[in-house]
């Protein structure tokens, strides 16, 4: 078997669909505190998307109807790193964000699931166990 050269060298952005771009921009910018780095807009047209920086990957919110794509919220969460899940959760709850269940302690990390205004599943995440100490590290 001949191996092909690895064509993919990284992840440029993760797309998040939205039905209401202005509401979604406000949520990611003001509620989550992410830095907006771009607004996608053709001259004379309505905006069709925006990008937010997380420090490791860009989140691109897209008005999918403007791209001819039917809206479907993400049901697999995007995990946002935070230093303290409990503190970040309390801050978001004080802003009106509703969480799905209690904070999870997996033995490796803490995480808390919530949704953006369009129902896209998001996750506050903090890994407290170094990867070498993970229970499944020997199996991988």
PLM regions with names:
Residues 1-25, 76-78, 128-140:
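N-terminal beta-strand motif that seeds the catalytic metal site of vicinal oxygen chelate
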Residues 18-22, 78-121:
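Vicinal oxygen chelate
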Residues 51-55, 114-117, 127:
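Active-site beta-strand termini and strand-to-loop segments that position acidic
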Residues 46-48, 74, 108:
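Exposed loop/turn and edge beta-strand positions of beta-sandwich/beta-sheet ligand-binding modules
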Residues 60-62, 113, 123-125:
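Conserved beta-strand in the GNAT
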Residues 6-9, 15-58:
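Core segments of cupin and vicinal oxygen chelate
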Residues 38, 105, 124-131:
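Short beta->alpha transition motifs characteristic of CBS
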